[in-house]
Amino acid sequence: MARILIVEDDSDLNNAYKIILENEGYDVVSVFNGQEALDALKTFNPDLILLDLLMPVMGGLQFLQEYELDKHKQVKVLIFTNMENSPEVNEAYNLGAHRAIIKSWTAPQNLTRVVDDALGNGSAATTGNK
């Protein structure tokens, strides 16, 4: 099953996403900011990263700059945000993100469909597609 890295500072959402995806059989590591994500990536090689944009310590955009997705083309990144069509979302696309998921439109229980779609295993409604 696919490996997923969750990078979300809201502990309730982080925990809910982790439980849901683990229950579906995914190998999941979850962290709370971009710096923790960079640290986790030293030992965990995900197929998909679910990335919040606005976080303390290191936000999603800075993480994307540091991670250099062009060197990790096999990894897909979905941005979690509440900012549809914002400059930050556009910048995330420029840095290699594949899609933006509006948090308020994607209930935690629908996360599996979104992930399956991103990994090529299904179809789900999202706000953007690179």
Give residue ranges: language-model regions:
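Conserved acidic carboxylate
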Residues: E8
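Receiver (REC) domain active-site loop signature in two-component systems and cognate sites
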Residues: M55
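Two-component/phosphorelay signaling modules centered on CheY-like receiver
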Residues: S11-V29
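Active-site beta3 strand of CheY-like receiver
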Residues: F44-L50
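Active-site residues of response regulator receiver
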Residues: D52, T81
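Helix N-cap/capping motif at the beta->alpha junctions
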Residues: S30-D39, G59-G60
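Short amphipathic alpha-helix used as the core "switch/output" element in two-component signaling
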Residues: D39, L61-K73
